[in-house]
Amino acid sequence: MSYAIVGFGEIGQALAHAFARKNIDVTVASRQPPEALAPQARAIGLTVVTKSLQNAVEADTIILAVPFGEHREVAKTLPSWEGKTVIDATNAFPVPEELDGLPSSAVIAKAFTGAKFVKGFNHLPAAAVMGAKLMAV
């Protein structure tokens, strides 16, 4: 099983720390080039590796930790998300009109055609994730 975190802000970095604490390999990517993320990734742990977005989405499980409005750009990196699991850690604040009363995860799930889709981690502040002792990732 391979893992990637797309988005390397507070939540993305907190999740990377959680993987590193458990000595689990995880790829991280963002709109910045991998080289720009490398110092932060190395500081988190040896199991945290930076890659381009295109390479990161080759993982089996992708944690989406980007602002709500950026989910479509991530979804466009693959023509089909068949066989992938996408964990949506986004929050839609302020609530975009495009939701039309739907949960943000319902809107995001439509962009990731064929993926198994899970909503998670969005209810926790980054500090809670940083200190959490996750039983499983």
Regions found by a protein language model. Name each.
Residues 1-39, 43:
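NAD(P)+-binding Rossmann beta1-loop-alpha1 motif at the extreme N-terminus of oxidoreductases
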Residues 6, 10, 15-18, 108-137:
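Oxidoreductase cofactor-interface core, primarily capturing Rossmann-like NAD(P)-dependent enzymes
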Residues 30, 50-52, 119-122:
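Short loop/edge segments at beta-strand edges and connector loops
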Residues 43-47, 81, 103, 134-137:
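Short, hinge-like loop/turn segments at secondary-structure boundaries
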Residues 44-48, 113-116:
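A short helix-to-beta-strand connector/capping loop
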Residues 45-60:
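Short acidic low-complexity segments
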Residues 53-56, 77-79, 131:
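Short amphipathic alpha-helix with an adjacent loop that forms part of the alpha/beta core around
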Residues 63-64, 68-128:
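Rossmann-like NAD(P)(H) cofactor-binding subdomain of soluble oxidoreductases
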